[in-house]
Structures are given as C-alpha cells and as structure tokens.
Amino acid sequence: MTGERSIFWQPWQGQGMEHLRLTYHEDHVVARGDVQGIAALAPFRLRYKIKCDLGWRTRKLDIELYELHGCRELHVKADGQGNWREEELGPLSELAGCLDVDISATPFTNTLALRRLNLQPGENAALNIAYLKVPELTFHPASQRYSCNWRAPTGAIVTYEDCSAASRPTWRSMPTGW
C-alpha cells in the first residue's frame, strides 16, 4: 500500500496544534509531524520524522526543536529489536528492549504501538517504550498499557494507560481507521 494522509490535532487543554503527514511506501512508513505549543510559558515548535518498517517498529527518529534561544536536534536509530543509538552519543543502553518511541508532545506516537500490536476486543498489552520528553529532549524507558475496548469498521476504541506516570496532554480530533 502506498499513499499519503494528512491529519491535524489540537490539545484539549492549553495552546497548540499538530499537523501530521503519514506516508506509506512499499517497504516502510514515514510520519512527519509539526507541533507548535507552549511549555513552561515559552513557545516551541517541534518537527519530527519517524521512519518505521512495515511492522510499525521505529527504525529512525529525527527531531528538530525550535525554542526562543535556538534550535536543538536529535537523531536516533533503532534496529527494531529494542536497541537504540543516538547519532552523537552512541548506544542508548537505558532504552534496551523498548520497541516503540513515545514523544510527549504528540498523540501520534501511541499509534505506533497500536498498529504493531493490532489488539482485538478484550485484549490488552503492557510494554516498555522509549519516552521522549519535550521540550527537554530527554529519553527514559516507561511502561504503558493498551486495551482494545471494541472495534468498529472505521477503527478501534482503545484505552491508553501510562503506568509510569509520565504525564501528557489529552488531544482532540484523533482520527480513526488507519
């Protein structure tokens, strides 16, 4: 399957907006997101690009974070087996075993685990993820649980629980049927 989809999100609380472009290729999927928001009373713009294999495992993550004092970048590769490497720092051993990335500033990254798991009604899964906190741009492993409540032709209703208490905003206009 090839093609492209464009999606917009807005947080329920606070100020912000995200534009996501999801592009399906023959052998991989690319998500490009542009998030604008406010953190600690300061505006920021986060641009990310995530390349996944067809099993929705993160293989490459590129981040650009624009703040009042300039731009910071982060470039990470993953082997799809739970090993992560930052371009300048080398191996990120604290993330060993994490297959999915979750960027705090976007709801999209929860989709990666959902697509990979393909939960059916009544099923749930607990997993460890590589959590990227924005605007700090710091990684740490976190535990999350996903439960599929029911499935409709256009998508599924899924409950997301952050078992490690790393908080994130709640977003509206989340699309279904991917």
Describe the predicted segments one by one.
Residues 23-28, 51-58, 78-81, 153-154, ...:
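Short, solvent-exposed coil/turn segments at beta-strand boundaries
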Residues 40-88:
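Hydrophobic/aromatic-rich structural module bridging two neighboring secondary-structure elements via a short loop
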Residues 1-55:
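Short N-terminal edge-element motif at the start of the domain
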Residues 2-19, 24, 74-159:
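Solvent-exposed helix/loop surface patches that form functional interfaces
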Residues 31, 46-50, 61, 158, ...:
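Hydrophobic residues positioned within well-ordered beta-strands of beta-sheet architectures
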Residues 14-15, 42-45, 69, 139-141, ...:
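Short solvent-exposed loop/turn micro-motifs enriched in small/polar/acidic residues
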